[in-house]
């Protein structure tokens, strides 16, 4: 039961509190000199074990800072004490007490994550509206009744998209308003072929404004993108920016 609870708690950490980089934090213990470091370890296995311990410690350090901002305060000493006692088999709390405490921690983490999610969701809506307003005032930008913004870089020639059942081949780059790139077929080195009906609404609408060989920039509001859903690196209620090159069209 305790192991199961701990796995669920660690999963919550991974989803909401994963540190950007372990190297951003100082290790809990410091080695005074290179010579001491060289003499301390007897073989590679000892170094591997130590490295795993440092990674865990850095992870805990980063988690502390994130938790403090959410009103969850834990101390390093007792975590290290718990690890030590678990290894030695000399526990200071019963399994029943530990299970109850971990259940409460899991509940607190879920509540904290929900609050953080809602805060991020509202902030994205505010910043997104400001970005859309500013972008809409730029030269060459068109706006549709649905709220989609677009700039045609190259109209293309020949075949046009005539139905949602069309099969399209595209090169594209997707990013957020802060410049974070979340996907790119260019980086993968090859275009992607898919059915128009299977892509987000912003693509379905926007790609109809260009022909085969055309290029377009789409600024997609949440209602035409992923809405309030969090998709991998894309926060809820995000404005999506896509630069798309329409390479081929097959109207089926």
Curated annotation (Swiss-Prot):
It catalyses: [protein]-peptidylproline (omega=180) = [protein]-peptidylproline (omega=0). PROSITE patterns: FKBP_PPIASE (PS50059). GO terms for molecular function: peptidyl-prolyl cis-trans isomerase activity. GO terms for biological process: protein folding. The keyword Isomerase applies. The keyword Metal-binding does not apply. Coiled coil: none annotated. InterPro entries: PPIase_dom_sf, PPIase_FKBP_dom, PPIase_FKBP_N, PPIase_FKBP_N_sf. It holds the Pfam family FKBP_N. Keywords: Isomerase, Rotamase. Residues 165-252 form the PPIase FKBP-type domain. It is an enzyme of class 5 (isomerase). Its EC number is 5.2.1.8. Belongs to the FKBP-type PPIase family. PPIases accelerate the folding of proteins. It catalyzes the cis-trans isomerization of proline imidic peptide bonds in oligopeptides. This is FKBP-type peptidyl-prolyl cis-trans isomerase FkpA. It comes from Buchnera aphidicola subsp. Schizaphis graminum (strain Sg).
């Amino acid at each position: 039961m305790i192991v199961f609870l701990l796995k669920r708690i660690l999963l919550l950490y991974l989803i909401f509190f994963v540190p950007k980089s372990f190297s951003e934090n100082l290790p809990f213990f410091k080695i005074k000199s290179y010579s001491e470091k060289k003499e301390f370890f007897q073989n590679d296995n000892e170094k591997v074990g130590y490295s795993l311990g440092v990674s865990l410690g850095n992870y805990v350090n980063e988690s502390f800072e994130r938790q403090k901002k959410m009103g969850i305060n834990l101390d390093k000493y007792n975590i290290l004490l718990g690890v030590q006692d678990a290894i030695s088999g000399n526990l200071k709390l019963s399994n029943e007490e530990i299970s109850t405490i971990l259940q409460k921690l899991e509940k607190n983490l879920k509540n904290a994550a929900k609050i953080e999610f809602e805060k991020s969701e509202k902030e994205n809506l505010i910043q997104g509206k400001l970005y859309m307003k500013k972008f809409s005032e730029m030269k060459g930008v068109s706006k549709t009744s649905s709220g989609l913004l677009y700039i045609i870089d190259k109209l293309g020639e020949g075949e046009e998209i005539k139905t949602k059942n069309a099969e399209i081949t595209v090169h594209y780059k997707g990013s957020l308003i802060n410049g974070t790139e979340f996907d790119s077929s260019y980086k993968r080195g090859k275009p992607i072929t898919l059915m128009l009906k299977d892509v987000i609404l912003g693509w379905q609408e926007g790609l109809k404004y260009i022909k085969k060989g055309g290029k377009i920039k789409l600024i997609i509001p949440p209602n035409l993108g992923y809405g309030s859903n969090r998709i991998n690196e894309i926060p809820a209620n995000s404005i999506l920016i896509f630069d798309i090159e329409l390479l081929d069209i097959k109207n089926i």
